[in-house]
Amino acid sequence: MTHEEHHAAKTLGIGKAIAVLTSGGDAQGMNAAVRAVVRVGIFTGARVFFVHEGYQGLVDGGDHIKEATWESVSMMLQLGGTVIGSARCKDFREREGRLRAAYNLVKRGITNLCVIGGDGSLTGADTFRSEWSDLLSDLQKAGKITDEEATKSSYLNIVGLVGSIDNDFCGTDMTIGTDSALHRIMEIVDAITTTAQSHQRTFVLEVMGRHCGYLALVTSLSCGADWVFIPECPPDDDWEEHLCRRLSETRTRGSRLNIIIVAEGAIDKNGKPITSEDIKNLVVKRLGYDTRVTVLGHVQRGGTPSAFDRILGSRMGVEAVMALLEGTPDTPACVVSLSGNQAVRLPLMECVQVTKDVTKAMDEKKFDEALKLRGRSFMNNWEVYKLLAHVRPPVSKSGSHTVAVMNVGAPAAGMNAAVRSTVRIGLIQGNRVLVVHDGFEGLAKGQIEEAGWSYVGGWTGQGGSKLGTKRTLPKKSFEQISANITKFNIQGLVIIGGFEAYTGGLELMEGRKQFDELCIPFVVIPATVSNNVPGSDFSVGADTALNTICTTCDRIKQSAAGTKRRVFIIETMGGYCGYLATMAGLAAGADAAYIFEEPFTIRDLQANVEHLVQKMKTTVKRGLVLRNEKCNENYTTDFIFNLYSEEGKGIFDSRKNVLGHMQQGGSPTPFDRNFATKMGAKAMNWMSGKIKESYRNGRIFANTPDSGCVLGMRKRALVFQPVAELKDQTDFEHRIPKEQWWLKLRPILKILAKYEIDLDTSDHAHLEHITRKRSGEAAV
């Protein structure tokens, strides 16, 4: 961004006013969005107003519409719900109510409205916008506003952010609040699992989501449920028979519990509701199992927002302000949404229309159509769920291949979920699946055993690495590894791990020249808390680590708020990769995050101290600074602590905290469980294809570059990239990719912490259109 453009961003909002409101059901992460809208709005020179109690406040006016300040949104990032209140409003549905709302906005000179809510709230906003000029002329005729006021407010810009735990809005992969709701559900499922196992019980869990089965579907994927009922895919007519058969099969395989997940809107093929009580009675009557029903209810809306929702809310809030301030009378009302990990702007009414089309398709019992309209990510989840839950592994292993699965590097939450789905998809495809203990070292020593279906039972929710993992690389023991590949007849290798898994893959590629046995296909699934594997925007385990850091930072901020005038310096893990420090800084509202990728000098440290000195003069008397463990070999955590302590004498005192290995532990978050499960399934499907491709004269021979890949999430899709091609994109000395997408989020972190900097927020989002899936297209 040039100096001129930076100046333009700083003055973009001068003379403009933005109102922000939250409407409809509350969702965790709404506060992060409100905070970002307020702070970025103020940064650009605009005036920002809170509208309390949703549309009701807009209609009532008066004290419900208050100007926001920088400090008024402090300490709200970690709160659930919405601080400015929300209400379902009948008045706004009537034209009379909208007329009063228009009057309240015009009188304050507000022409930009940011609405955070579900599809109903956003549709209401669009109606309001389309009537705007008529409402103004009515107000003029009635003499309530002057001609000058009418000219000044001649058009209304509207941007919507989707805040809803149901994830039922088409056009965005994730709505604000969905991830946190999944956190609440998984906490409960994990807790129920232990009691169910003790008593050999069957639990029927009912989750929220109205007419959208997203929460139920992802929950069942993340906890390995026996059955899921969702409105988009009603079960076949003989489902009672099928369900009971499945439950008794899992029991005979040795499982001590059954879990059935029911979406609150679940129906059968004829549109008749299927309730949790119906299911309980069926299981008790036919199988005689001890069965309990748990309806989760409003617990799902509560609690602290997850790191994902805080970052999502913050990113969406920034993009919303930019969309509002760049708006003209001709730009349609848009909604800021997430596609893959990119912020995009979509026309509001297109999204609302597709969302309505889903309901219409379901009313007309066109369930396939409804499923397609839900989008790529929903279809993906459904396909993987069906594979893992519904298909029985074939008994005969004729024509099967042998695939080995291993963990390499440091433990990361979600590794076990990836192993589980890899093993099970392998078995479903009729392959023999071996598991290797202790990484490449175990492969050399022959610590290899065959895994059956129940070997990986209940692994999804367990943290760490059950197979055992080591950082050892294969090069030193190629001879033993080759011997074991031959001995166990291994024809494909799935390597789940961090940077060592990737470098190990490169070494295997090199070794193919000397050892023919190494000419087998392999795929690397990135799993490391550091998120430093080239070829993927995300690694399995990073989300769990991020949430752990976030929770700790919240507690530390609380302690600092109590003692006043205190600055905490926190050291995070990640090697040379600053992902955890940056993202945790964004999610916890840090004042600064020092990372290796963005070199800093003593002058920068000095500037940060001065910034904190200024901050102590405001009502917010606390500071939080994150430092990545290897950001600078001389400016260590101790050095920064000593510098802050000395420079802050008499103004603030400092404390330091090194988080350490707690960041590798904990049970995996819903995101990591789901991501790992999908990656495992995708990797195994690729592997089966590659083995068939490389099968010649009765043996496997794969020596092409594309037979050794990293499976990674790139912007909007999961892609396989040959390890050899990724070599040029890697900084091997510092074990990081040369280009990292999240660096573009750093300016947001600084602006939200009140630094005067350039506003270049990632790849600039332009208005796009919804791409509808044709029936023949495969889900990515």
From Swiss-Prot:
Its cofactor is Mg(2+). Its EC number is 2.7.1.11. Coiled coil: none annotated. Allosterically activated by ADP, AMP, or fructose 2,6-bisphosphate, and allosterically inhibited by ATP or citrate. The modification N-acetylthreonine is found at residue 2. Keywords: Acetylation, Allosteric enzyme, ATP-binding, Cytoplasm, Disease variant, Glycogen storage disease, Glycolysis, Glycoprotein, Hydroxylation, Kinase, Magnesium, Metal-binding, Nucleotide-binding, Phosphoprotein, Transferase. It catalyses: beta-D-fructose 6-phosphate + ATP = beta-D-fructose 1,6-bisphosphate + ADP + H(+). One of its GO terms (molecular function) is metal ion binding. Residues 402-780 are annotated as: C-terminal regulatory PFK domain 2. PROSITE patterns: PHOSPHOFRUCTOKINASE. Glycans are attached at residue 530. Substrate binds at residues 164-166, 201, 208-210, 264, 292, 298-301. CDD domains: Eukaryotic_PFK. Mg(2+) binds at residue 119. Gene3D superfamilies: 3.40.50.450, Phosphofructokinase domain. ATP binds at residues 25, 88-89, 118-121. The modification Phosphoserine is found at residues 133, 377, 667, 775. Residues 391-401 are annotated as: Interdomain linker. Changing residue 209 to D: In GSD7; loss of activity shown by complementation assays in yeast. GlcNAcylation decreases enzyme activity. One of its GO terms (biological process) is glucose homeostasis. Changing residue 180 to C: In GSD7; Italian. Residues 2-390 are annotated as: N-terminal catalytic PFK domain 1. Catalyzes the phosphorylation of D-fructose 6-phosphate to fructose 1,6-bisphosphate by ATP, the first committing step of glycolysis. This is ATP-dependent 6-phosphofructokinase, muscle type. The gene is PFKM.
